[in-house]
Amino acid sequence: MSRQTPSLSFEVFPPNPAVGNDKIITALQDMRELTPHFISVTASNNKFNIKETTVRLADFIQNDLAIPTIAHLPAIYLTKEKVAETLADLDKVGVQKILALRGDIIPDVEPQKDFRYATDLIEFIKEQAPHFDIVGACYPEGHPDSPNQILDIQNLKKKVDAGCSSLVTQLFFDNERFYDFQDKCTLAGIDVPIHAGIMPILNRNQALRLLKTCENIHLPRKFKAILDKYEHDPESLRAAGLAYAVDQIVDLVTQDVAGVHLYTMNNAETAKYIHQATHALFNHQSLG
C-alpha cells in the first residue's frame, strides 16, 4: 500500500508591531509562489497583543494569499476568557486551525492558572469551539521540562486523545532520533500524522542562539563538523547549512514522513532554496 505524498509547509512569526509588516508581507507574497500546504503563524508569550500580531497576519495569509493557515496559541499566560476571545477573532477571519501550545516560561513573569499544560488548552478548545482543527507540538528528543521520554510520550498521547488531529515536531538535526521517536509513538498508540520540523542553519549567530535555547537537541558529528569548519566563513556556512537541511528532507521523504514543516525565520530566500531543491518530492494540493 503506497503512502500519501508528504506535505511541505512553512512557519513564520509576526514582526514587532513597532517595525511594521512590510517586510513580512513581501516575504509571504514570495512564499505564496511556492504553494505551501499551509503556513503557521507563531504567537509571543505575554509580549504582544495576539489580535494585532498573530490574528492579523493569519488573516492576511488565509484570505489575501489564499493559503491555509494555522495560528499558534500558547496559553500559559492566557486566561480562559482571553483564549475564547482569540478563538472568536480567528473564527471571524476564517482561520479554524490552531497549534495548541503551553508556551515557554518567561523568567520573572507569573503564569496564569487556567492552562498549566497544552492538554488543558486542547480540552478547552474542543469544549468551546469543537469545529476548530487542533495541531499539537511534539519533541523527538524529549520536552526540555520532561524528566524522560517515556513520560513525554505518555503526555503526548493525552494530547492526541484530547483532540489533536496531527503533530508538528520541534526542530531536529538527527533524523535517526526522529525515526526512533516515531516508532515509540506508534507503540504508544499515537497514530496521527507527524510533521517533521526542519530549520536550516544559515549563520553562526543563529547556531549559537539555537544551542543556548534548545539544549535538548542532539547535534550529529556531520552537523558539528559544518559549524566548526565554516565558523569564520559565513558564505560557506550558509551553503552547507542549506545543503544539510535538504539532505535531511530527502531522507525524511524517502522514509515516508507525513510532512516537512520548514522553520523559515521569515526568510523567503531560504524557503525558495529548499523548495527548488525538493519540490518534486512534495504534493502541494491543499487539504482545504
Mark where each language-model region is.
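C-terminal helical cap(s) of enzyme catalytic domains, especially alpha/beta-barrels
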Residues: 178, 268-287
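Glycine-rich, positively charged N-terminal anion/phosphate-binding segment
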Residues: 21-30, 47-65
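Active-site mouth loops of central-metabolism enzymes
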Residues: 7-23, 69-81, 135-151, 229-243
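Glycine-rich, proline-tolerant flexible connector loops at the mouths of alpha/beta enzymes
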Residues: 35-57, 104-113, 165-178, 264-267
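Conserved, mostly hydrophobic/aromatic
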Residues: 11, 39, 90, 159, ...
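Active-site pocket-lining/capping segments in soluble small-molecule metabolic enzymes
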Residues: 19, 113, 117-139, 187-247, ...
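Glycine-rich anion/phosphate-binding loops
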Residues: 23, 75-89, 112-116
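Conserved N-terminal beta1-alpha1 strand-loop-helix module at the mouth
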Residues: 2-41
